[in-house]
Amino acid sequence: MDISVIDATKVNAETGLHIGESNAPVKMIEFINVRCPYCRKWFEESEELLAQSVKSGKVERIIKLFDKEKESLQRGNVMHHYIDYSAPEQALSALHKMFATQDEWGNLTLEEVATYAEKNLGLKEQKDATLVSAVIAEANAAHIQFVPTIIIGEHIFDESVTEEELR
């Protein structure tokens, strides 16, 4: 994945799901798609460290659910529409459930994914096309093509980021 073309100055800390204190000194911006296996790996492997950093007030996570045109990621696009951005803790819990059950819903039809989100995960569809469009426009302006893409200040990481690099 070529992250050298990404322009981090085109990324904002406003749009997205905010986890943690808004006055935290470090803003971590994460472009992810919940159907992507590399995003699941990133989410699960970084969760403990990030939870501690958020709890201690050092980091605010801004998670940007990035709808992708790639056929294999379209199921993630459907799931993204079940995240309630107005309730960050519940939204983070929903992301955990989505990643934990990715193997169950990941090959369903798009309609079946929506049903799975409602019946199996107990989620309600959130209609926020403006936010979805804003994340896509932001990613395009910054030349972000792949997920996961993690931006911390001027530093840009992909799925190969290590825990040591995050510290």
Report each predicted region and the residues it spans:
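Gram-positive cell-envelope targeting signals
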Residues: 1-3, 18, 38
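N-terminal leader/targeting and pre-domain segments
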Residues: 2-10
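A short beta-strand-turn-helix
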Residues: 9-27
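Conserved S/T- and glycine-rich ATP-binding loop of Class I adenylate-forming
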Residues: 28, 36, 150
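C-terminal cap of thioredoxin/glutaredoxin-like
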Residues: 31, 42-50, 115-167
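Structural alpha/beta surface segment adjacent to cysteine/selenocysteine redox centers
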Residues: 32-35, 40-114
